[in-house]
Amino acid sequence: MRKITVFGMGSFGTALANVLAQNGHDVLMWGKNVENVDELNTHHMNKNYLKDAKLDSSIKATVDLNKAVQFSDIYLMALPTKAIREVSKDIDQLLTSKKTFIHVAKGIENDTFKRVSEMIEDSISSEHNGGIGVLSGPSHAEEVVIKQPTTVAASSKDNNVSKLIQDLFMNDYLRVYTNNDLVGVELGGALKNIIAIASGIVAGMGYGDNAKAALMTRGLAEISRLGEKLGADPMTFLGLGGIGDLIVTCTSTHSRNYTLGFKLGQGKTAEEALKEMKMVVEGIYTTKSVYHLAQQEGVEMPITNALYEVLFEDVPVSKSVRTLMERDKKAE
C-alpha cells in the first residue's frame, strides 16, 4: 500500500483516484473548489464531473496545497496542460525531498511547445525530482470509474518509473503496459485531440463513414510525421498511446474534443460550444501549439492547419473541408 496525492479533481483524476483506492492505496485529492472537496469528503461523489459515480469511501480531498504535498511521495498530476507549470512551481516551493510525478495531461504548452513531462521538469528543482512519467491511452473516465475493461500505456525516461505506474494502477479491469517511448506516448495523447475535434466536425456536418475513416487515417499520418520529426518512434503511434487513443477520442460522445467538433459542425461558434459544455477542451490549446510547432519544424499538417483556421481565424467549417479536399494531387 502506497500513499498517493492526486492534484486535480476533474473526471479523469477522480476516476484514477478511485482505481488507486480500490487497489488498496491511501489517496488524497487536491482541488481549489471547496464545494467539490466537501462533496467528495461527505458524500464520496464528484457530481460536476462524474455525476452518477459512487467513489471509494477511503478517498479524501483537501484544498490545502501544503497538506497535499506533505501527504505522499507519489504525485498524480491530473490537471489541464495550461495549469501544470503553475501548480508544479507552487508544489516545488513546498518540497523538501524527492517525489515521483505521474501525469495524465494530454497537451502541448502554447508558448514553449513543450510536452507536459518537460513542463514538470522545468518547474521542479533537480533535488526534488524523483522521476516523471505519463499514463496515457484510450481511457474515458466515465468507463474507468464503472470498471469497464480499459488498457493504457505507462511511459517514462526511467524504466523504474514506468514499472511503478504499472504496479500502482493495474488490476482486473485496468491493464497497464509499459512503453519506453515517452516522447511518442505524450505526443500521441496530445495530437489526437486535434483530430478528434476535426472528427466531430465531420460528424456534425452529417458526413458518413467514408469521411470519418479518411480523417482518422490521414490524421494518424500527420501525428506520425510530426512525432518522428520530434524524436518519437513511429511504431508508438500504432499502439495504445497512438491509434488506440485516436480511435476512442474520435468516435465517442464521451470525448470533449469530439463533442466540441460536433457542435462546430452543426454551425455553432467555438465560444458558443464551450459555453454549453462548461469543461476544458485540451484540443483547442493543442491545435494552437501544434499549428505553430509544425510550421517551425517544417512538417506538413493540413488537417491541423484547417482546424486552426476554424478555431482562430473564423473560417467556416464548410470552407475548410472544401480546402482539404481540393489540395494538390499527392501520393499517399
UniProtKB/Swiss-Prot annotation:
Its EC number is 1.1.1.94. PANTHER family: GLYCEROL-3-PHOSPHATE DEHYDROGENASE (PTHR11728), GLYCEROL-3-PHOSPHATE DEHYDROGENASE [NAD(+)] 2, CHLOROPLASTIC (PTHR11728:SF1). Catalyzes the reduction of the glycolytic intermediate dihydroxyacetone phosphate (DHAP) to sn-glycerol 3-phosphate (G3P), the key precursor for phospholipid synthesis. This is Glycerol-3-phosphate dehydrogenase [NAD(P)+]. Pfam families: NAD_Gly3P_dh_C, NAD_Gly3P_dh_N. Sn-glycerol 3-phosphate binds at residues 106, 137, 139, 192, 245, 255-257. The active site is at 192 (proton acceptor). NADPH binds at residues 11-12, 32, 106, 141, 256, 280, 282. The keyword Lyase does not apply. It is an enzyme of class 1 (oxidoreductase). Belongs to the NAD-dependent glycerol-3-phosphate dehydrogenase family. One of its GO terms (biological process) is carbohydrate metabolic process. GO terms for molecular function: glycerol-3-phosphate dehydrogenase [NAD(P)+] activity; NAD binding. It is found in: Cytoplasm. It catalyses: sn-glycerol 3-phosphate + NAD(+) = dihydroxyacetone phosphate + NADH + H(+); sn-glycerol 3-phosphate + NADP(+) = dihydroxyacetone phosphate + NADPH + H(+).
